[in-house]
């Protein structure tokens, strides 16, 4: 694939900058001051390297490069087949092995090393015999279900390659019997009907033609449990559907026949003339018409049907209600402080507007920034929404070319607020938000989520298409919207329409901003016969016809109307009507969305809205009368000359998810250097403080010994003689030390004790000595604090050089656990930008390779729109300020620590433009190199959708069982069930994340160092869209597990555990199986579960992987979790494997990562030299990124056919060919450039910078403001919101906190050691510090006041009120009994909701104000009265001793 010169230069420039950074990092690393002498982040290889690593054979990459350069990709693939079969890459043993290797390698070359086609798609390659014919040998390709993911072209090519391999091996062709042919005919049809609709459903004749002529057998394994009637066909091993084979034949060979013919010609393969004839015949012939014949029963039924007179829109609404029900799933949980913006599908919520702005699509909604302001800025740029449809979540970005809210002001006036500045001006005067405004949602999101298309609301981009269509049909003038048109055509059209040509030109070029005046819009409708312009169309169908009829009569009888005239067209200019006369019809005007003012007791409708109201009503010349089964617009269109389309059919609900994020990544607590200081640094882990106080720290740390002078210490370079030291390995039993060279000779085993050596030991260090030396080395003395870590969590326990920490402290930056410095940000997609938006001059952009705007005009102005290159990113100014500090740190590091020239020399953040970063996302396998091209004043990271999609995610299928402990009880549950045990779901960076457990849940992991099974906290659980395929690993004893192709898998190799990507794992690799015995129903708990030993090394075993299969994913989602510390989990039948990767979305400067990242620092790399976890992709290939982005639409406007099809409630997949998507360009140079958008915006950073949620303090204030917004939005029931906040957030929190108090751990204030039970002497056995509770009373009842406010002020269910009051009683009774001396006497408060409940039910309140006397108001029973009588003395129990506080208890003990 040849790219245009500009794009090729772009990638070459990126590679040059990458190579430059690597050269500098290599020079620095070569000095020996770091754990490794080389850079530890490898670059991803080119296509040839990918092919070799994916499918082999070894050594083929070099030859592929040579052949591709000489012959091109297609011929090179065949040449490689020749060389493999000739044995140039080694003896493969059998002809079948040669055939399999040749097919996989050739296909990998043709698909440029994409994983799915050569590995997962082809299950097997066999040489079989035509036993039913002449017993000759032929080649059979066995396809698996995941071949679907490789695309039709790759499927078809695999058949072509198979035929070439067959010829090279001298095999005969496949000679199918009639049984074989009819079996495939049945399978294709059955698959289409019973499993899933094929993109191309070939006729039986087409299937027979292909089967008779394809020279190899297309077969495969059973993929679906659907039996066929053509059973026991010779040579076919299954009687079930072979999904892979069906897809290859139908969607591969037959659907892609035309494309395949081009490859046949290019590669010179003979014997496929039949396919050329098939293509020619198909192009000449008439398309087949299905379903023309009608049965007698159907025709009779048709005759007996009763014709019901029903309006078009009325019937559409009925069909809409029947087929697409509102979905309240997103609104079932409402978090305190995060508003619900619209109830499900409620009119007045977000109005659906199909399209993709230059900063939306790809699970991102565009909304008018005025909407953000008028919802009290709870929505800001980058805020995440939980949505009703098409997906579950979206990020918000600003779009100014769509409609904003329609609001009612406190004086009764109604106003359209499409402008950001107007929103700021009127925000304090808004009483009600009648209509929330538009949400631009991409067609691609509907395709991705397979959501039925909702009827499109009438909008400017639809109207302009009808406008140009009418011009063409009536006047035969061809014009195009959203582009420059020929002057001649413009002149001709403007003559016909009698309008200014310049206005027509501008309106066609930008119809979203340039709107005709109302009188001209009416003129267009009359002349061209098109509906009234949507800007002047009111929400007629939001109002009942009877209400419009009443309004019509009032206007006819009482309104004062000022009329005007335009070219013989009469239109209203002003309407004045008394508010008293109007009465409740004032609400009708409001619901119509008609702007008007209220002044001096009159309702005044000014220009142009007077015409917008009266023109559809025929200027009151015909009588509007309500009609059964007719919507308002149906009645108007039946009577009026000027027709209307509905602008308000489809509404979508949403609530606020997670607020936007853009801040530096800090460990908790923040760390400046990965150096252990133990208890010597105090609770702040301050190394400088420990040094000043002359303390000695005792920590687990790796030491190194100088082979020359014998110096021992944590430094990698000897401070005395400058020699690179050797790591000292230590025997944990006898404490003998062995330098690396000696330990290697002993196979890292102590020769005395026969125990595995460790690379670290518990040693004493003197911080003062080490810090003074480091300060001298880098000449940094004035830092206030130097924050280290309590202890190293890595398996090597190698510390960072203290010099790095000093330089970080000097520049005020913080390190992450792997040695890098990161900045987190919410992902937001962008495909086009204006130079002024990102603060970059045109001259600078030209230097970066941006020479033209997106329309191909030379770049000369800061207001031109430019298409973003795929690996360029636009960071927030917050990120810019922080990365500037990081750049200064890196320069200091190079200069003061490594003695190399400074690299960035940045004084202001604009100096970072053009420099490279690495982008990482949650649960990903690789970083992607990006280039900074600008900064915006918004808390998001804008980047190309390809860039965001390149950060892949890895997980397990939902039915994977995992070993966990729930409320103290060990049990196995599925990952899907685990996900449901967490709450507070948010959508971030393309995955769903939940962090808040509903119960006390921990996961079991294996400490690979000790072999013990240990309990680990769960940081979060995730749910991600599933890939089309998974890898299934089957072990020698029958156990198995499945995972995504790129997921890390723990395997045992060369005496140690290492991590491999799933696709790298080979048959014969060994995995750990823990042979622990688990009593799932046991309810007993142990004193300290952290030391629980459910399994040990001698009871565990290593099992070989016997079989690896690529299988089709059965679910739409995959799941995983982040387990703290050990980062592995026990799944299915006790198989131990790695969890998902756990990094949050972040960027880091490339050179910082290359200099400072080390696998030796990573906590999950326990024991052994493992593969580096971070690989960077240097050249982005859209074919290899997350397939979600392949559905992104890339057109300038949606065609008229699309809007009309939405009225039929079609599946988006039926319109896949109508709107161009990224998928349509894959494999072509155009996949990188020429992408278009439908909606422009004035500024990608226009809108609130920070959500109000982040600015407010306590929960009560957040909830109050949340409910104020709910009250204001017509589409929201605030009482329902209050109920949901209580039931989904506050009550579970109150009850959960109450439960956690009784199960809490105890903590040492000094060293932070935690205890399940407190030591008897009340002091920490580790450091002698004070022991305190980890859950306080304040933490338990922090939401109680908020909850009581809600049940007092809002109409919630009585049951909910009582739950709150009972919870308050439980809290009070707990603390009365535990800490009686701290309880104050409760005074009866008549305003308290709970005490009022008691009084209402009993007529009295007990002294504590609790609900103990709550009854149903009936008289006491005799039994109850007896129960209240005082007991006899003998029955009385002795009084309980006074309960004392822990504080008092501990102080007494210590005296």
UniProtKB/Swiss-Prot annotation:
Listed Basic and acidic residues bias regions: 1419-1438
Modification after translation (UniProt): This protein undergoes a protein self splicing that involves a post-translational excision of the intervening region (intein) followed by peptide ligation.
InterPro entries, sorted: Hint_dom_N, Hint_dom_sf, Intein_C, Intein_N, PolC_DP2, PolC_DP2_cat_dom, PolC_DP2_central_dom, PolC_DP2_N
Positions of the UniProt region annotated as Disordered: 1409-1440
PROSITE patterns per the UniProt record, alphabetical: INTEIN_C_TER, INTEIN_N_TER
CDD domains to which the protein is assigned, alphabetical: Hint
Function in brief: Possesses two activities: a DNA synthesis (polymerase) and an exonucleolytic activity that degrades single-stranded DNA in the 3'- to 5'-direction. Has a template-primer preference which is characteristic of a replicative DNA polymerase.
Cross-referenced HAMAP family: DNApol_II_L_arch (MF_00324)
Name under which the protein is recorded: DNA polymerase II large subunit
Annotated organism of origin: Pyrococcus abyssi (strain GE5 / Orsay)
High-level lineage: Archaea, Methanobacteriati, Methanobacteriota, Thermococci, Thermococcales
Gene transcribed to yield this protein: polC
């Amino acid at each position: 694939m040849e790219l245009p010169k500009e794009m090729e230069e772009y990638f070459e420039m990126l590679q040059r900058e990458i190579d430059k950074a690597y050269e500098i990092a290599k020079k620095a690393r070569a000095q020996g001051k770091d754990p490794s002498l080389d850079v530890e982040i490898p670059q991803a290889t080119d296509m040839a390297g990918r092919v070799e690593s994916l499918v082999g054979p070894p050594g083929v990459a070099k030859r592929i490069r040579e052949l591709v350069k000489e012959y091109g990709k297609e011929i090179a693939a065949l040449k490689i087949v020749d060389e493999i079969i000739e044995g140039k890459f080694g003896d493969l043993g059998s002809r079948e092995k040669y055939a399999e290797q040749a097919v996989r390698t050739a296909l990998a070359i043709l698909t440029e090393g994409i994983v799915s086609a050569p590995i997962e798609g082809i299950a097997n390659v066999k040489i079989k015999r035509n036993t039913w014919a002449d017993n000759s040998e032929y080649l059979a390709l066995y396809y698996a279900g995941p071949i679907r993911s490789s695309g039709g072209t790759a499927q078809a090519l695999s058949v072509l390659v198979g035929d070439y391999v067959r010829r090279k091996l001298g095999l005969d062709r496949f000679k199918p019997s009639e049984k074989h042919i009819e079996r495939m005919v049945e399978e294709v049809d059955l698959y289409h009907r019973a499993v899933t609709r094929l993109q191309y459903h070939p006729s039986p004749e087409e299937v027979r033609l292909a089967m008779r002529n394809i020279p190899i057998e297309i077969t495969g394994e059973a993929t679906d449990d659907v039996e066929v009637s053509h059973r026991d066909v010779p040579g076919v091993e299954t009687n079930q559907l072979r999904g892979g084979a069906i897809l290859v034949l139908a969607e591969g060979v037959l659907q892609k026949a035309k494309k395949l013919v081009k490859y046949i010609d290019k590669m010179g393969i003979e014997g496929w003339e039949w396919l050329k004839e098939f293509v020619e015949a198909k192009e000449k012939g008439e398309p087949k018409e299905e379903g023309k014949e009608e049965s007698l029963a159907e025709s009779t039924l048709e005759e007996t049907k009763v014709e019901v007179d029903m309006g078009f829109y009325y019937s559409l609404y009925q069909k809409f209600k029947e087929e697409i029900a509102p979905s309240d799933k997103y609104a079932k949980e409402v978090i305190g402080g995060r508003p619900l913006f619209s109830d499900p599908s409620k009119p007045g919520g977000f109005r659906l507007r199909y399209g993709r702005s230059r900063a939306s699509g790809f699970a991102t909604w565009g909304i008018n920034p005025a909407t953000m302001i008028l919802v009290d800025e709870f929505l800001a740029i980058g805020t995440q929404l939980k949505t009703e449809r098409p997906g579950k979540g979206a990020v918000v970005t600003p779009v100014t070319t769509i409609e904003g809210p329609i609001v009612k002001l406190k004086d009764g006036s109604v106003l359209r607020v499409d402008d950001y500045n107007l929103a700021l001006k009127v925000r304090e005067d808004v009483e009600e938000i009648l209509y929330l405004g538009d949400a631009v949602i991409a067609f691609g999101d509907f395709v991705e989520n397979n959501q039925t298309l909702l009827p499109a609301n009438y909008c400017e981009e639809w109207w302009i298409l009808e406008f140009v269509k009418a011009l063409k049909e009536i006047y035969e003038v061809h014009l195009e919207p959203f582009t420059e048109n020929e002057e001649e055509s413009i002149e001709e059209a403007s003559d016909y329409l009698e309008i200014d040509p310049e206005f027509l030109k501008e309106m066609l070029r930008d119809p979203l901003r340039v709107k005709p005046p109302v009188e001209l819009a009416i003129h267009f409708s009359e002349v061209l016969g098109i509906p009234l312009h949507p800007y002047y169309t009111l929400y007629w169908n939001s109002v009942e016809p009877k209400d419009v009829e009443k309004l019509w009569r009032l206007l006819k009888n009482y309104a004062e109307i000022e009329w005007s005239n335009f070219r013989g067209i009469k239109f209203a200019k002003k309407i004045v009507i008394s508010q008293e006369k109007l009465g409740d019809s004032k609400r009708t005007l409001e619901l119509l969305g008609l702007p008007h003012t209220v002044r001096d007791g009159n309702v005044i409708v000014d220009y142009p809205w007077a015409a917008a109201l009266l023109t559809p009503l025929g200027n009151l010349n015909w009588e509007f009368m309500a009609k059964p089964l007719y919507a308002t617009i149906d009645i108007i269109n039946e009577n009026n000359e000027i027709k209307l389309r509905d602008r308000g059919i489809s509404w979508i609900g949403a609530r606020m998810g997670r607020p936007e994020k853009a801040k530096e990544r800090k460990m908790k607590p923040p760390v400046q250097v990965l150096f252990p200081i133990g208890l010597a640094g105090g609770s702040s882990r301050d190394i400088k403080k420990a040094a000043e106080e002359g303390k000695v720290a005792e920590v687990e740390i790796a030491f190194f010994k100088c082979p020359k002078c014998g110096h021992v210490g944590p430094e990698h370079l000897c401070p005395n003689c400058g020699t690179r030291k050797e790591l000292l390995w230590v025997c944990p039993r006898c404490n003998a030390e062995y330098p690396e060279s000696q330990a290697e000779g002993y196979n890292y085993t102590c020769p005395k004790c026969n125990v595995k050596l460790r690379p670290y030991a518990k040693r004493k260090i003197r911080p003062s000595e080490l810090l003074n030396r480091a300060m001298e080395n880098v000449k940094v003395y004035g830092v206030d604090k130097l924050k280290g870590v309590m202890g190293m969590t890595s398996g090597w326990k190698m510390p960072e050089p203290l010099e790095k920490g000093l330089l970080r402290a000097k520049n005020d930056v913080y390190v992450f656990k792997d040695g890098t410095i990161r900045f987190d940000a919410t992902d937001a997609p962008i495909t086009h930008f204006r130079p002024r938006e990102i603060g970059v001059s045109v001259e600078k952009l030209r230097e970066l390779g941006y020479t033209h705007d997106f329309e191909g005009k030379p770049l000369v102005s800061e207001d031109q729109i430019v298409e973003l290159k795929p690996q360029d990113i636009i960071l927030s100014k917050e990120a810019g300020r922080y990365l500037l500090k990081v750049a200064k740190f890196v320069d200091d590091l190079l200069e003061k620590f490594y003695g190399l020239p400074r690299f960035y020399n940045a004084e202001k953040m604009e100096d970072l433009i053009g420099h490279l970063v690495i982008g990482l996302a949650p649960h990903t396998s690789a970083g992607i190199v990006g280039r900074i091209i600008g900064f915006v004043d918004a808390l998001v990271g804008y980047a190309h959708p390809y860039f965001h999609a390149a950060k892949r995610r890895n997980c397990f299928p939902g039915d994977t069982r995992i070993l966990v402990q729930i409320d103290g009880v060990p049990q196995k549950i599925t990952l899907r069930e685990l996900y449901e045990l967490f709450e507070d779901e948010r959508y971030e960076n393309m995955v769903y994340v939940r962090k808040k457990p509903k119960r006390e849940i921990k996961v079991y992991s294996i400490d690979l160092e000790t072999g013990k099974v240990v309990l680990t906290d769960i940081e979060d659980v995730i749910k991600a869209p599933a890939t089309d395929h998974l890898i299934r690993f089957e072990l020698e004893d029958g156990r198995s597990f499945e995972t995504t192709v790129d997921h890390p898998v723990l395997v045992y190799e060369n005496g140690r555990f290492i991590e491999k990507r799933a696709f790298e794992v080979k048959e014969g690799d060994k995995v750990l199986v823990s042979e622990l015995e688990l009593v799932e129903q046991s309810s007993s708990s142990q004193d300290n579960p952290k030391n629980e030993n459910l399994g040990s090394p001698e009871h565990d075993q290593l099992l070989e992987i016997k079989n690896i299969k690529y299988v089709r994913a059965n679910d739409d989602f995959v799941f995983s979790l982040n387990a703290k510390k050990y980062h592995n989990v026990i799944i299915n039948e006790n198989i131990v494997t790695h969890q998902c990767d756990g990094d949050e979305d972040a960027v880091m400067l490339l050179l910082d990562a290359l200099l400072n990242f080390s696998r030796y620092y990573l906590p999950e790399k326990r024991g052994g030299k493992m593969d580096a976890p971070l690989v960077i992709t240097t050249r982005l290939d859209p074919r290899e990124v997350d397939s979600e982005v392949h559905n992104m639409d890339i057109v300038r406007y949606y065609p008229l056919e699309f809007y009309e099809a939405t009225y039929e409630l079609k599946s988006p997949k039926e319109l896949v060919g109508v709107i161009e998507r990224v998928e349509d360009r894959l494999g072509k140079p155009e996949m990188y450039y020429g992408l278009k958008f439908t909606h422009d915006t004035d500024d990608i950073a226009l809108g609130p910078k920070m959500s109000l949620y982040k600015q407010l303090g306590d929960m009560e204030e957040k909830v109050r403001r949340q409910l104020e917004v709910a009250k204001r939005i017509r589409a929201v029931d605030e009482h329902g919101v209050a109920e949901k906040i209580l039931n989904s957030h506050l009550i579970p929190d109150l009850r959960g906190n109450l439960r956690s108090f009784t199960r809490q751990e105890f903590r040492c204030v000094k060293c932070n050691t935690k205890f399940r039970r407190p030591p008897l002497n009340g002091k920490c056995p580790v450091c002698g510090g004070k022991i305190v509770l980890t859950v306080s009373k304040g933490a338990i009842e922090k939401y109680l006041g908020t909850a009581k406010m809600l049940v007092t002020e809002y109409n919630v269910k009585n049951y909910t009120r009582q739950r709150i009051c009972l919870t308050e009683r439980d809290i009070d009774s707990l603390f009365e009994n535990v800490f009686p001396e701290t309880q104050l006497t409760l005074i009866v408060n008549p305003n308290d909701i709970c005490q009022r409940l008691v009084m209402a039910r009993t007529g009295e309140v007990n002294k504590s104000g609790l609900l103990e006397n709550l009854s149903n108001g009936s008289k006491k029973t005799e039994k109850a009265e007896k129960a209240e009588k005082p007991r006899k003395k003998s029955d009385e129990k002795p009084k309980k001793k006074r309960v004392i506080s822990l504080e008092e208890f501990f102080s007494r003990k210590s005296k």
